[in-house]
């Protein structure tokens, strides 16, 4: 049955007022949104405001005991957290779908070969299948770039049958590839990266890092290194991608979750020079990497911590939402 709400006008007015406050918060950083994006945010704001007002109104009609009141307040605090997350997600969706023009450059740039700096590509590995790692190195050997080196470091792998085939493969690939097996070596992945940083050619101006199971596209360096033409640019980041997402439903769902981060969250962060650096498909200016004393070995998320240290020193970073490998 339809039940009359005697103070419906006041509730509606409160809903409108709350919606305006939410919209003011959402529109503070939405200058680049099209009308579709603003309309989407308005719908979200009014829906959330209506839900909140009705929930609180219905709650006040209940007979309250001290326990019920305490539980109700706790649930309201939890609901506030959920609402804040929903608002942040809505803003990210709006920017991903309805942004009229990006504030940051995201298209590949070109420079003539004589202006491209030398790049040192670092590949850390621990107890990795040699056949897989050799495929990674073969892909690096096919890079379309005039001046680069590849440093492979295997740290703490005990079985020589695992790392020696990779060492031999590096020798076959030529002088551009250098292999290091170090045991014992502390510092985990960061320790391995710092080791090869000390072995890097002094002429290298950019350090790039990939994982041992990643097959890069030939144009990776040629497309992204030119962004370092900006002297304030310290980090150039490409997304992670995966080549087994179509094998089954579970892997497809995992890949969809990753894509939400790399195609939405990282894009909106890039608009504000606030990307999260990750230690694969990343490039760092060598001078800046030395300035922050290399990769932080004390931190399990050495990649994100490195990015924060670089931002703290006033440098910029950019994210290119194009897959350059899997």
Regions from the PLM with identified roles:
Residues 156, 210-215, 298, 310:
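The conserved acidic donor/metal-binding loop of glycosyltransferases
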Residues 1-113:
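N-terminal membrane-anchoring/stem segments of glycan-assembly enzymes
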Residues 146, 154-166, 183-186:
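A conserved acidic beta->alpha catalytic loop
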Residues 137-147:
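Short, acidic, metal-binding catalytic loop of nucleotide-sugar glycosyltransferases
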Residues 120-128, 143, 227:
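A conserved hydrophobic helix/loop-capping motif in glycosyltransferases and polysaccharide synthases
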Residues 168-205, 218-300, 305, 309-312:
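Long helical/loop segments within the catalytic core of UDP-sugar-dependent glycosyltransferases
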Residues 239, 314, 318-325:
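Catalytic beta-strand/loop signature of glycosyltransferases that borders the donor
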Residues 117-120, 149, 305:
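Cell-envelope/extracellular polymer assembly enzymes that use nucleotide-activated donors
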């Amino acid at each position: 049955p339809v039940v009359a709400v005697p103070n419906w006008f006041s509730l509606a007015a409160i809903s409108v007022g709350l919606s305006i406050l939410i919209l003011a918060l959402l529109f503070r950083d939405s200058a680049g949104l099209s009308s579709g994006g603003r309309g989407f945010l308005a719908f979200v704001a009014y829906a959330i405001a209506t839900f909140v007002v009705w929930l609180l109104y219905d709650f006040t009609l209940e007979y309250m005991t001290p326990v019920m009141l305490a539980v109700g307040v706790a649930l309201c605090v939890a609901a506030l957290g959920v609402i804040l997350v929903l608002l942040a997600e809505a803003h990210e969706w709006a920017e991903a779908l309805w942004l009229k023009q990006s504030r940051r450059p995201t298209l590949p740039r070109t420079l003539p070969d004589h202006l491209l700096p030398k790049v040192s590509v670092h590949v850390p590995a621990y107890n990795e299948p040699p056949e897989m790692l050799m495929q990674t190195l073969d892909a690096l050997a096919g890079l379309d770039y005039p001046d680069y080196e590849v440093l492979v470091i295997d740290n703490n792998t005990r079985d020589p049958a695992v790392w020696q085939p990779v060492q031999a493969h590096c020798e076959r690939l030529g002088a551009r590839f250098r292999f290091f097996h170090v045991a014992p070596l502390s510092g985990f992945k960061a320790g391995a990266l710092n080791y090869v940083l000390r072995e890097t050619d002094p002429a290298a101006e950019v350090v790039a890092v990939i994982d041992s199971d990643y097959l890069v596209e030939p144009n990776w360096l040629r497309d992204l290194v030119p962004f370092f033409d900006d002297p304030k640019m310290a980090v150039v980041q490409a997304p992670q991608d995966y080549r087994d997402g179509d094998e089954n439903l579970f892997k497809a769902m995992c890949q969809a979750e990753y894509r939400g981060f790399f195609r939405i969250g990282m894009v909106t962060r890039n608009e504000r020079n606030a990307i999260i650096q990750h230690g694969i498909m990343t490039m760092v200016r060598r001078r800046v990497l030395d300035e922050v004393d290399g990769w932080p070995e004390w931190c399990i998320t050495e990649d994100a911590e490195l990015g924060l240290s670089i931002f703290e020193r006033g440098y910029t970073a950019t994210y290119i939402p194009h897959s350059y490998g899997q």
